[in-house]
Regions:
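Metalloprotease/metallohydrolase-associated module, dominated by Zn2+-dependent proteases
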Residues: 1-69, 85-126
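Active-site recognition of the HExxH zinc-binding catalytic motif
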Residues: 72-84
Length: 126
């Protein structure tokens, strides 16, 4: 039985660590809730590209794709952990866009400007 973590998941977890460390080092109060690691569960199902349980108790990610697309979904799910609402409200998109910008500046994410397939769904930055 192979118990090694898939390489693309390992890379995304390292980028996630870099983001958390940056938020700690800069005392980013807006994203203070993201400074502690959230457990990540990987899957290869195509009906769900990502989910967030109880605002950061666990994040599930489809890992059938390249690391940038996986990171896109992780950022999307992390943004859900920053607001009380469960929908994609204006407040959600504000937090999401700020996280995208931080990750871009850290060099751990390249924006996806065109609709692109990932795990059977279209993903794109808004």
């Amino acid at each position: 039985m192979n118990t090694r973590e898939p390489e693309n998941l390992r890379i995304v977890k390292e980028k996630y660590r870099i983001l958390r460390e940056h938020l700690k080092e800069t005392n980013n109060e807006e994203f203070e809730m993201l400074q502690k690691p959230i457990p990540i569960t990987a899957h290869t199902r195509t009906e769900t590209i990502g989910y967030n349980t109880n605002k950061g108790q666990e994040i599930g990610l489809c890992i059938s794709g390249d690391t940038n697309k996986i990171m896109h979904v992780l950022i999307h799910e992390l943004a859900h952990s920053t607001i009380k609402e469960y929908d994609h409200s204006d407040k959600y998109w504000d937090k999401y866009n700020k996280l995208i910008q931080i990750c871009k500046e850290l060099g751990i994410y390249e924006p996806i400007t065109q609709k692109t397939k990932f795990c059977g769904k279209d993903v794109q930055d808004k």
